[in-house]
Amino acid sequence: MENQKILVAKYAIDRYIKSNMNLGIGTGTTVYHAIKYLSEKLKSGNLKNLKFYTTSSDTKYLLSKEQIPYESNFSKLNKNLDIAIDGADEILLEKKSLIKGMGGAHLMEKVIAYNSETLLIIADETKIVKKLGTKMPIPIEVAPNAVGFIMTRLEEMNLDITLRICNEKKGPIITDNNNYILDVKMHVENPEGTEKYFKLFPGILEIGIFNHKNTKIVYYQNKQIKEA
């Protein structure tokens, strides 16, 4: 699958990324390959004057490793970014709806994505599903003081909920924004309606369902690169 990720990352960048763009950079293994290829194109001079806006501490680290400067201050932005490049955990092609957030960065990923003219998703064939929630739970970022209230409310809806726990230390995962993540197992019949509904719960800061109005998907399937 790593080779598929490399192929789609290179294809998407060659096709859609131009010099002088303001780019949002997502989080995850596929984005890692995009950063590596962007670094090559910047060093060769094939791309110039790109500004990068990051979604996580992990992305900042990867950009720094490639000696690519990034913008830390978003407060001066007064217009949308040109393109946000990101991966996905599940993709429903017919609606261009996504699940994101298994890397714990979906709050800032959505801030960057929904404030970009285009959300450019790159993915291998394992990410394509016929219904969201088939393989992955839905990540929900929650304010720590609200987690008990939210878990009770979701349990009353007969949903299967898990507080995401760290593997390397005891206790829950803390996001870059100092919040908790709940993973909710459910099949999503209506992605747009589900996204809007859960955002109404006080204490839920963001849900990992994405329905960007202008999503382009570059993916690998049946031994070829496809677009949706």
UniProtKB/Swiss-Prot annotation:
CDD domains referenced in this protein's UniProt entry, alphabetically: RPI_A (cd01398)
Active site, UniProt feature: E109
Superkingdom: Bacteria
Pfam families tied to this protein: Rib_5-P_isom_A
GO annotation (BP), single: pentose-phosphate shunt, non-oxidative branch
Subunit comment: Homodimer.
Biological role: Catalyzes the reversible conversion of ribose-5-phosphate to ribulose 5-phosphate.
Name by which UniProt lists this protein: Ribose-5-phosphate isomerase A
Organism (species): Borreliella afzelii (strain PKo) (Borrelia afzelii)
High-level lineage: Bacteria, Pseudomonadati, Spirochaetota, Spirochaetia, Spirochaetales
